[in-house]
Amino acid sequence: MADSEKNSCSCSFCGKIHSEVRKLIAGPSVFICNECIDLCSGILQEEGRSYKKTDTLDLKPKEIKKVLDEYVIGQEHSKKVLSVAVYNHYKRLSNSGVISEVEISKSNVLLIGPTGSGKTLLARTLARVLQVPFAMADATTLTEAGYVGEDVENILLKLLQAANFNVDAAQRGIIYIDEVDKISRKSENTSITRDVSGEGVQQALLKVIEGTVSSVPPQGGRKHPHQEFIQINTDNILFIFGGAFDGLDKIIESRHRGSSMGFEANVQKVSKNKDIFCYTEPEDLVKFGLIPEFVGRIPVITSLSELNESTLCRILVEPKNSLVKQYKKLFEMDNIDLQFDDSALSEIAKKAAVRKTGARGLRAILEALLLDLMFESPGDVGINQVVISKKMVEELMVNSRLFLKH
């Protein structure tokens, strides 16, 4: 090839001519340079490292829980239940190619607990521990096909995006759907009319969680005939659902009262138990408004208790990525040593307990508490240490809009 002809050829991807690269490889009407080949190779290797093929799970239930303990404080029973469910799920995958007379069903999980009790954090941490793609959705935004709103397939698209469109990795991922209690039917009886935000969504989810091959539009949005689709098999995707289920406690109490046969002590024991959701049975969820088929596809049910002041105080400092550690790091970047008195931490936890917003309320309080300091201290060479005391917490919070309603 003559020099003039070489220089007229350029890489079809980056546009560089032959003299600007070490090698230019020709194909039918296209060229690619060695630099673009190296770049593509790096991308493929990175995707291969991002998500291992989780056909086998090296971690045992105790080891899974141990990692969860590093990030999630309290909720011991729920962490144990989740660890076993996840272990069994991926053990099922590792034997999926083995011919067996016994077909093992998926261990989809339902987490019942108040706002801020750690439902989302548990699901997200599990995905991180297992190194699998993770997607999250809000059940209240979903509608069945044909209605205005978000299709169930869009959740699968989020999972694909989290997996860098690696279909094999996505098919072994975890999907967390929050606020599932908000899509309950208005009554236990089947309605003649369609319930767009209730039973219809449950029916749409049912097909996906029990296992099907879904056609997912790569650009999202509604499906149309001229669009290309990505086929994703949901058989091996683990679904975790979460919800506060306000009013379910009354249903549980009513069931115990009806079956107690005069043993009032048993009813009183259930009624006074703060963790009444631990008595949840599938029939209670059906009475609440979830359809029987949907409940039947979620064999593992566990409850999370409301976080008390003591647990909230531990959450501030103990997790690997605790809020106190995060804010200390932020101040450290400005060469400022941030310290908290124990009494200050107790007061912050007390404020969060009053708000009843759980762990997520802690960040709002800390943000309000440290706002002025984060505004004033950067660039002030006279400040090299800040110590937060109980008195500062009380004084700074007196006029805070965050607490005016309390």
UniProtKB/Swiss-Prot annotation:
Q: Tell me, which GO biological process terms does this entry list?
A: cell division; proteolysis involved in protein catabolic process
Identify a single GO molecular function assigned to this protein: ATP binding
Parts of the chain that traverse the membrane? none
Q: Name one Pfam family in it.
A: ClpB_D2-small
The alphabetized UniProt keywords are: ATP-binding, Chaperone, Metal-binding, Nucleotide-binding, Zinc
* Binding locations of Zn(2+): C11, C14, C33, C36
Gene Ontology cellular-component annotations: HslUV protease complex
Instruction: Check the record and name the InterPro entries matching this protein.
Output: AAA+_ATPase, ATP-dep_Clp_protease_ClpX, ATPase_AAA_core, Clp_ATPase_C, Clp_protease_ATP-bd_su_ClpX, ClpX_bact, P-loop_NTPase, Znf_CppX_C4
CDD domains given in the database record: RecA-like_ClpX
Residues holding ATP: P114, T115, G116, S117, G118, K119, T120, L121
Does the keyword field hold ATP-binding? yes
| Chain ranges of the ClpX-type ZB domain | 1-52
Q: Which Gene3D superfamilies match?
A: 1.10.8.60, ClpX chaperone, C4-type zinc finger domain, P-loop containing nucleotide triphosphate hydrolases
Q: How does it assemble?
A: Component of the ClpX-ClpP complex. Forms a hexameric ring that, in the presence of ATP, binds to fourteen ClpP subunits assembled into a disk-like structure with a central cavity, resembling the structure of eukaryotic proteasomes.
Family recorded in the similarity comment: Belongs to the ClpX chaperone family.
In terms of NCBIfam families, this protein maps to: clpX, PRK05342.1
This molecule's function is given as:
ATP-dependent specificity component of the Clp protease. It directs the protease to specific substrates. Can perform chaperone functions in the absence of ClpP.
* Entry protein name: ATP-dependent Clp protease ATP-binding subunit ClpX
Organism annotation? Ehrlichia canis (strain Jake)
